[in-house]
Amino acid sequence: MVTKIICQGAEAKIYLEEDKIIKQRIPKTYRNQILDEKIRYSRNKKEAKILYKAKKLNLDVPKIYNFNEKKQIPQDKDKLILEYINGEKLSDFLDSYSLKKQMNIMKKFGKQVGLLHENDIIHSDLTTSNTILKKNKVYIIDFGLSYISKKIEDKAVDIHLIKQALNAKHYKNYENLYLSFLEGYNSNEKKEILNRLEIVEKRGRYKH
């Protein structure tokens, strides 16, 4: 069985092992060992529970394999074993598609995010780097920063992130892509969230 590292961040190393992703949280040597273990386990548990919840809601996210459904905790304290989504990362491929296909993809992406928010799941890192197209489905990955919140502000900030990402990375068709995202984004709180988004953006401009 071949295992290779495909990514390393500040918090975790990501390995590919056949058709599975292993996310191994990195120990922090500057922290007290017992405290570090607690922090890593807490973050591991939170990410696992949110991924499990999203999958149960039939959202297009990776399956989690090492999760104890009965106890609602991961079976490992510092790693997650996830489904490998072998598709096209949108940050690399979106601009190469026809405009019609790009807009259709963004509409699907918006629908997925709307379902996350309907169930109070905040992703916190919504970019096309964390979105993969596979067999005409749009998968959202990397829930490492995700959390549960009912706050309109938090949902608005989530949308602000994808809006910024589109403007920075896919600026050529930015307006069409963002409008397509909003077309797909359905939530009972959509009006309130978009109103709050305007406030968030004004606040950001004021800071700069």
What positions do the PLM features span?
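ATP-binding glycine-rich loop module of kinase domains
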Residues: 5-45
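Short, glycine/acidic-enriched loop or turn micro-motifs at the edges of active sites
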Residues: 69, 86, 128, 145, ...
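Conserved kinase catalytic-core helix
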Residues: 51-59, 93-129, 134, 138, ...
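Conserved hydrophobic "DFG−1" position in protein kinase catalytic cores
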Residues: 16-19, 24, 66, 84, ...
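C-lobe/activation-segment region of protein kinase-like
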Residues: 139-208
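Nucleotide/phosphate-binding site architecture used for ATP/NTP-dependent chemistry
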Residues: 1-15, 59, 189-195, 200-201
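Conserved structural core of kinase catalytic domains
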Residues: 41-44, 62-106
